[in-house]
Amino acid sequence: NRKGKAMPNPQDIFQLAQQTATQVTASPENWRRFLYTAAHNYHTTYLNQLLIHAQRPDATACATMKYWNEQAHRKVMYGSKSIIILQRYQGVPTAKRVFSMTDTVLTGDKAAAPWEVTDAIRPLLMQVNSVGSLMDRETEQGVSLSDRANRVLATSIEDSALNWSHPEDQRFILQEVAAQSTLYMICIRLG
């Protein structure tokens, strides 16, 4: 709200995400352009990836000004334009401003890279290496990630463009699109 700029209405922001979802799924080229944005903002939700893509398709590693200024050894440059995303606060969707890493400058000797392996996550990565897939591990609620993924797949198929295909093929097609999209994003990240 600085400089008297009011935050946009969460309903308007959600509508922008819906419009963007329609646009990015309209053609393979539009989807590839969206995947570029998603690959550089993989830490956030699909909804927020859509919002970032709609406002700044070239944005990378978007985070709040507080994160950049206080934790990442970076400062947001004066005059940088924020990107509006949605987050839930006590169950209510609220607008939140984030900035691309390209809108920041280094303030110290060492920058905290958003994708680097830190001591905090190293044990989890080692556990994944020794145990294999996390898909069969249970969450705090006693539900495996595989079960959760299956529920997400089922709800993603409902009311989607996959209605043209045979019901037995819908899940396979969606999984294939997700797998190919993930591989494409990995290739983008690897250069």
Give, region by region, the residue ranges found by the protein language model.
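N-terminal accessory/interface modules of nucleic-acid-binding and processing proteins
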Residues: N1-G191
